[in-house]
UniProtKB/Swiss-Prot annotation:
This is Glutamate--tRNA ligase. SUPFAM superfamilies: An anticodon-binding domain of class I aminoacyl-tRNA synthetases, Nucleotidylyl transferase. It holds the Pfam family Anticodon_2. GO terms for cellular component: cytosol. It is found in: Cytoplasm. GO terms for molecular function: ATP binding; glutamate-tRNA ligase activity; tRNA binding; zinc ion binding. It comes from Cronobacter sakazakii (strain ATCC BAA-894).
């Protein structure tokens, strides 16, 4: 039997981290089993579904490289198929037309609630033989079994049982002729030969209804696995106040897809004590019986730690391809300065996100108009004039511009003036970067370049002279 899973989001908003984890688990299970992964867009909610949301879902899937083997299928393009199946069910007696008015149903609901009963349809039209005109408005309901129970072996939670008495004769076609969500899902899973339905635990109550419809159709019943919810670190349901919840917001905030995938896979699944997983390792080790039944807590600090890890362990050339987008967002012209892969090596230890890297790298490529006030006040003082002049001359004299030779020039300046390295290094750092912090000074000066470094030292000397004249 070929294993087939699916990810079936509703395009009413962005791809959130809970949906992304569900997609990842479905994708990993299919890949682990040598099966296929289907993308299906469940867009039957015509009022809330938007093209922008569809695009956002596709963008998120593509950014995470969760490639699909089939699809994307759209439910709105399959209405003829759904209605054909409903007509077959009407003919077979497994579905029936219901003409009850909204007023009657509301009165029934209020009566049941007043008695402390669970609100459900009473089956009036199921047993009615009244004649109705062909054009009289009606819904179509599924004739749910009225005895026995539905038992399914959840691949994460174990056996789950529902009494059929607890289940309603749910509506499968509305008065406007449109099929409902629970019905469309069933026909899709049947037609697409889905073998494993991996989805959030909020769908558990839908499962017995869908199983009963599948059985009424004589269709095979897939295996189900319901993944627990993701909470914030305070134990409450994950929301925007816990940080970003959209996958693409994490891209915008400077996270690598590898970091988010690694974080999401561990958010409810484990393989021993291992924390870091490559994509290949995720595929190799993933198993549904290792997925936790308990809710997971989203920890942004852990995700940030993983992101920093991947910035420093993935190939700099690869990280640079993701950094490029952030550089463009900051409108930095990188034609004059280090290659982005080199920049990743320079700033990787200091920066935990690519956004932070893009926001702190401008001095490598563009001249700055002023020095950081605190750094200049502390380090660009008259006492710094001589160290800056001497190191400028030594840097200017270098014929082989390497980081090692830059280091020797700084060291030689300190030795010549008989001062500590800090007396040379700190004024030089402020002079060439405009700030009081940077990566190692030798690699920073080397990356900025000889002529630009000398120009900036001269600018710092002019700043010191101007400050002296004002005193």
């Amino acid at each position: 039997m070929k294993i087939k899973t699916r990810f079936a989001p509703s395009p009413t908003g962005y791809l959130h981290v809970g949906g992304a984890r569900t997609a990842l688990y479905s994708w990993l299970f299919a890949r682990n089993q040598g099966g296929e992964f289907v993308l299906r867009i469940e867009d039957t909610d015509l009022e809330r579904s938007t093209p922008e949301a569809i695009e956002a879902i596709m963008d998120g899937m593509n950014w995470l490289s969760l490639e699909w083997d089939e699809g994307p299928y759209f439910q709105t393009k399959r209405f003829d198929r759904y209605n054909a199946v409903i007509d077959e069910m009407l003919a077979a007696g497994t579905a029936y037309k219901c003409y009850c008015s909204k007023e009657r149903l509301e009165a029934l609901r209020e009566e049941q609630m007043a008695k402390g009963e669970k609100p459900r349809y009473d089956g009036r039209c199921r047993h009615s033989h009244e004649h109705h005109a062909d054009d009289e408005p009606c819904v179509v309901r599924f004739a749910n079994p009225q005895d026995g129970s539905v038992v399914f072996d959840d691949q994460i939670r174990g056996p789950i049982e529902f009494s059929n008495l607890e289940l309603d004769d749910l509506i499968i076609r509305r008065t406007d002729g449109s099929p409902t969500y629970n019905f469309c899902v069933v026909v899709d899973d049947w037609d697409m030969e889905i073998t494993h339905v991996i989805r959030g635990e909020d769908h558990i109550n839908n499962t017995p209804r869908q199983i009963n419809i599948l059985k009424a159709l004589g269709a095979p019943v897939p295996l189900y696995a319901h993944v627990s919810m993701i909470n914030g670190d305070d134990g409450k349901k994950l929301s925007k106040r816990h940080g970003a919840v959209s996958v693409m917001q994490y891209r915008d905030d400077g996270y690598l897809p590898e970091a988010l995938l690694n974080y999401l896979v561990r958010l409810g699944w484990s393989h021993g004590d291992q924390e870091i997983f490559s994509r290949e390792e995720m595929i190799k080790f993933f198993a549904l019986d290792a997925v936790s039944k308990s809710a997971s807590a989203f920890n942004t600090d852990k995700l940030l730690w993983l992101n920093h890890h991947y910035i420093n362990t993935l190939a700099p050339e690869y990280v640079a391809t993701h950094l490029q987008w952030h550089i463009e967002q900051e409108n930095i012209d990188t034609r004059n300065g280090p290659q982005l892969a080199e920049l990743v090596k320079l700033l990787g230890e200091r920066c935990k996100t690519l956004k932070e890297m893009a926001q702190t790298c401008r001095y490598f490529y563009e001249d700055f108009s002023e020095f950081d006030a605190d750094a200049a006040k502390k380090h660009l003082r008259p006492v710094a004039r001589q160290p800056l002049e001497v190191v400028r001359d030594k840097l200017s004299a270098l014929t082989d511009w390497t980081a090692e030779n830059v280091h020797h020039a700084i060291q030689a300046t300190a030795d010549e003036l008989e001062v500590g390295m800090g007396k040379v290094g700190m004024p030089l750092r402020v002079a060439v970067t405009g700030a009081g912090q940077s990566p190692g000074l030798d690699v920073t000066v080397h990356a900025i370049g000889k002529s630009r470094s000398v120009e900036r030292i001269n600018k710092a000397l002019a700043f010191i002279a101007e400050r002296e004249n004002q005193q």
